[in-house]
Design a protein with these regions (language model features):
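Positively charged, low-complexity intrinsically disordered leader regions
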Residues: 1-30
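Short beta-strand segments enriched in small/hydrophobic residues
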Residues: 31-40
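Glycine-rich phosphate/diphosphate-binding loop of Rossmann-like nucleotide-binding domains
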Residues: 39-53, 136-225, 234, 238-246
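Short beta-strand elements in bilobed, periplasmic/extracellular small-molecule ligand-binding domains
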Residues: 56-70, 185-187
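Short, well-structured alpha-helical segments in soluble
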Residues: 76-88
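Anion-binding alpha/beta catalytic cores of soluble intermediary-metabolism enzymes, centered on
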Residues: 92-156
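Short, well-ordered coil/turn residues at beta-beta hairpins
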Residues: 96, 208-209, 229
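Rossmann-fold NAD(P)-binding glycine/threonine-rich loop
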Residues: 106-126, 230-282
Length: 287
């Protein structure tokens, strides 16, 4: 039976750190603030927004929503980004993606001020992740994966790690962050040949495949740590991950459940990035 890597334990510890940082800011008459830009009414965006704003309220971070219609023009979106860039009281910005197809996503993303890019979407932020340099925020989801690794004292040095999925949002940055922890990293994707054999070689597996239950027992072995990034709804209408939990849990050493794993940590990482952006702007140390 695998050890469950519970998001709530990581979140409790992380939230305590965030509260201390907020107290430091408050002592300097600063309230950290998140700007939220949402275009349209996608259910998953609204759900994430609800969780993010609730976490902000819990941790003493304010927020302001900038809601645009699905058919918003590129000019309208760019004007909104200019508005949040110029707003002195907004320290970090969450821009929901994917954007509607009629918009130039690359142009819009890179209009965001890099210092307010708390979800690592601009080219400058991504470059910081890939080069292993300070100066930008990594995307929140892979950051949450690494928070779990750190919290549970999972040693990456010299270990074989496999990341399943090569998206710029999760897979690629997660691989780079594991490299920075001295893991030997392989990225698997839809064109990988004999993927089960590749994944079985890994000590640490981060799964961001985007398909419910696609990773089953044939990919896994004893001794592995599995971090499941996926959030899907199965045929029974229940939340599930990209890993077949019933197959994996009796086999591997440790695994994140879905729900109750990476998702809740991601929300706290988002808030931490806003708070850290406020500290940086104020010239205060990030504790």
């Amino acid at each position: 039976m695998a050890k469950l890597l519970l998001g709530k334990e990581v979140t409790a510890s992380l939230n305590e750190e965030i509260r201390k940082k907020v107290e430091t800011l408050n002592a300097h008459q600063i309230t950290p603030k998140l700007g939220i830009i949402r275009i349209g009414e996608r259910e998953d965006d609204i759900s994430y927004e609800r969780g993010a704003t609730k976490r902000c309220e819990t941790l003493g971070v304010s927020y302001e929503k900038f809601l645009l219609p699905e058919n918003a023009s590129e000019e309208m979106v760019l004007n909104t980004i200019a508005q949040v860039n110029e707003a002195d009281d907004i320290h970090g910005v969450l821009l929901f993606r994917p954007l509607p197809r009629h918009l130039n996503e690359n142009k819009i993303i890179n209009a965001l001020a890099a210092e307010k890019d708390i979800d690592g979407i601009t080219d400058r932020s991504m470059a910081s992740v890939f080069l292993g340099k300070q100066g930008g925020f990594a995307p929140c989801t892979p950051s949450a994966c690494l928070k779990i690794v750190d919290h549970y004292s999972i040693d990456c040095t010299g270990k074989k790690a496999v990341v399943i999925g090569r998206s710029p949002v999760v897979g690629k940055p997660a691989a780079m962050m594991l490299l920075q922890k001295n893991a030997t990293v392989t990225i698997c994707h839809t064109k990988t040949t004999d993927m089960p054999s590749v994944v079985k070689e890994a000590d640490i597996v981060i799964v961001a495949a985007g398909r419910a239950g696609v990773i089953d027992a044939k990919y896994l072995r004893a001794g592995q740590t599995v971090i499941d990034v996926g959030i899907n709804v199965n045929e029974e209408g229940k939340l599930c991950g990209d890993v077949n939990f019933a197959d994996a849990e009796p086999v591997v050493d440790a695994i994140t459940p879905v729900p109750g794993g990476v998702g809740s940590v991601t929300t706290s990482v988002l808030v931490e990035h806003v708070v850290d952006a406020a500290l940086l702007k104020a010239g205060l140390d990030i504790l």
